[in-house]
Design a protein with these regions (language model features):
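Transmembrane helix exit motif
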Residues: 2-6
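Short, small-residue alpha-helix embedded
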Residues: 100-124
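Phosphate-handling active-site elements
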Residues: 90-92, 117-131
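Glycine-rich beta-alpha junction loops
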Residues: 1, 35, 73-77, 97-100, ...
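Hydrophobic residues in alpha-helical segments
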Residues: 40, 118-119, 139
């Protein structure tokens, strides 16, 4: 839906309205901070997001009907914070050191790992930790090969890291 505080060009208010309805039926959603703001009609913070701000955004997502939520990639200094919450009010966070620039497709890899590990019985905190660390490894690896960020991360050589889980 968007990144860095801006909706993608093709995302309309009507699309956002329908997406709110769609995510209301979700057991687990993994919006990035921009997407969470779009879904909750919250202005995107132009500073590192605070825990109270993330709490307010996650409560709005749960008010839509979402059971569990991971707001991904929230910038906090030299780290990215993943804010995990459920509709009962439980909250956890997973931080990873910024490994390099943003790459397209990392959210898709993230949700794929979370989905697979959830089905294997991992807790949402464990899923988030594994996914966040795998993404950071992929970014570092891609940077070491001077991979163009527009090509996405190189993750295939690192897949064996996930097989052992």
């Amino acid at each position: 839906m968007g990144d860095h505080g801006r909706a993608y060009q093709h995302i309309t208010p009507e699309f956002c309205h329908h997406m709110k309805d769609f995510v209301s039926r979700g057991d687990i959603i993994t919006p990035n901070l921009t997407e969470a703001c779009l879904l909750t009609d919250t202005p995107y913070p132009e500073h590192d997001c605070t825990d109270p701000e993330l709490s307010a955004i996650s409560k709005k997502l749960h008010a839509l009907g979402v059971k569990k939520c991971i707001i991904t990639g929230c910038p906090k200094g030299d780290t990215f914070l993943n804010y995990i919450s459920d509709s009962s009010g439980n909250v956890d966070t997973v931080s990873t050191k910024k490994a390099g620039p943003g790459y397209p497709g990392t959210g898709d890899i993230f949700v794929s790992i979370v989905s697979a590990l959830t089905l294997r019985g991992f807790s949402l905190q464990e899923c988030t930790t594994q996914a966040a660390h795998f993404i950071a490894s992929c970014i570092s690896y891609s940077q070491s090969l001077s991979n163009d960020t527009l090509q996405g991360v190189i993750f295939e050589p690192l897949l064996s890291d996930l097989v052992s889980l």
